[in-house]
Amino acid sequence: MATISNETPLWRLQQTLNHILPQSVRKNEKHLAVVHGPTQPALWEMTLGELLEFQCLRYRDLEAVVVPWTAARWTYGQLENESSHLARGLLAKGIQRGDRIGVMAGNCEEYVSLFFAAARVGAILVVINNTYTDAELKYALSHTACKLLFIVPRIGRHDLKNALEDLHSPDISKRLPNLNETVMIQGSFKSFGTYKDVILAGNVVPLSAVQRRQDTLSPFDVCNLQFTSGSTGNPKASMLTHHNLINNSRFIGDRMDFTEYDILCCPPPLFHCFGLVLGLLACITHGAKVVYPAETFDPEAVLRAISDERCTALHGVPTMFEAILALSRPDSFDCSQLRTGIIAGAPVPRPLMKRLWNELNMTEFTSSYGLTEASPTCFNAFTSDSIATRLTTVGKVLPHASAKIINPETGETVKIGERGELCMSGYQIHKGYWGNLEKTAEALIEDEDGTIWLRTGDEAVFNSDGYCTITGRFKDIIIRGGENIYPLEIEERLTAHPAISRAAVVGLPNKHYGEIVGAFLVLEPGHTCPPDDEIKNWTRQTLGRHKAPKHVFVFGLDPRLPLDMPQTGSGKIQKQVLRDLGKRLVGEE
């Protein structure tokens, strides 16, 4: 039963009495790098199906989901109705509580309907990365034992014909014994059923059956598996609950001052927390509207959506914003309503931020930090924070969450102002990795008070006001001659050069120093490449000599490189790919 109160049992929140005290920093933690979010507003205790029903009571006739590339415009009432019909179809297909349903598709209204339909019948939706190869798709289906797969023939330029042929082969039941059926969420392929077929199959199932199933569910049930973008080994599937997602998305929307009058343009993909939680659910929890401008990221479609839909917010990673700003805008372009949004996934160069402010009117943009295992957001700036704060920090910890910074070797909490590994605790921490107890035990640690902490693997520092600055990934730190070099400060210096749009700095092997600095660059449109010496001298003007890049590689100019910076499907730069590439190009000197 849905409730909105602050009487949730404390053990469910993995919190002790100390954990929920309202003080930002407690007396016995003075000077230590420990911060606690506010305890108000109270956490919501409901399932995703109950959330949608609850919001329909207030916003039934307001638009909830708009998809310009399919011409879909669904109100809250239509979304509830569509997901109810699909939920009946899932019951007709024999889906039980806890069964896994996979989806691999671009941003579309059917994806949103499936997300809520699966949640309403107690299934776990496995969102599969659009960029996965055939082998990675099969691994995801096998690892999570999906019973149903919803898929499309093509996602942008990614042709899935070979994968579909394999899924249609006679021996697929031997290789994927749990997969009962493949369904085309859009389009068609041979004898596979379609999304509409599933809805038709549900006509024999009464709506009351969906309600009965929904009444058996708990907000603390796992409802979503999201694969982490690990650099080595098979990806891990993070187990996220209704409670995780609903409350995290609420607090994200609160930081952007969302109301039912807001309209979010959301280019990030639905298979990622950015598009699903910070996008879709941040809107649903506030009665706002989400606009998915294209199947995959298309900067021209984003500009059209901002103008045509009168969007008030825009999400993206820095590379998306750079692509948007690189386009010429027609005279009719109107971004006068645009004010806020979240920029995440990578540090934001100051020149880019100035352009977002001046050219797109994003005066209330917010910086953010999160990871899949934390549902995802841990820290988010306020729209009222100063520009300097939003540029140099990721804001303050969200409500009902705690954060601390530890010495990664000793586990001891460091002092405020000292760098260390960021750890998170609170309602938003995932239940672990699906089918991987070993990795779960490595990431989730219990302190002497019985509080569970998630080790993020990210290096961070807190200031005396509780604001957090992410200083890098521990695995990305370059150790040159025994001295730690932090790539982020070099990247920020490089992108301050007028000719450099993006920079990624990695450590390359060196016999004498162990590692040396390598820089991969993308130039600003219309600029010529500065000589290597100029780039090194530019770095040395503000940083130590040893931090200047020994090797410089420029995308678009070096024929040995791909055309653009390698990224994950969610827009994060793949530094492991760059390290491997640099190692092949220069060897070990």
Curated annotation (Swiss-Prot):
Pathway(s) of this molecule: Siderophore biosynthesis
UniProt short sequence motif PTS2-type peroxisomal targeting signal, positions renumbered to this chain: 12-20
Molecular function terms, GO-annotated: ATP binding; medium-chain fatty acid-CoA ligase activity
Enzyme Commission designation: 6.2.1.-
Coiled-coil annotated residue ranges, if any: none
Residues annotated for ATP binding in this entry: 228-236, 367-372, 458, 473, 572
Subcellular localization, as worded in the UniProt entry: Peroxisome
Induction context: Expression is induced during iron deprivation.
Amino-acid positions noted as binding substrate in the UniProt annotation, renumbered to this chain: 372
UniProt KW keywords: ATP-binding, Ligase, Nucleotide-binding, Peroxisome
Name of the top EC class for this enzyme: ligase
Presence of keyword Nucleotide-binding: yes
GO BP annotations, alphabetical order: fatty acid metabolic process
Function: Acyl-CoA ligase; part of the gene cluster that mediates the biosynthesis of hydroxamate-containing siderophores that play a critical role in virulence via intracellular iron acquisition during macrophage infection.
Family: Belongs to the ATP-dependent AMP-binding enzyme family.
Name of protein: Acyl-CoA ligase SID4
Gene: SID4
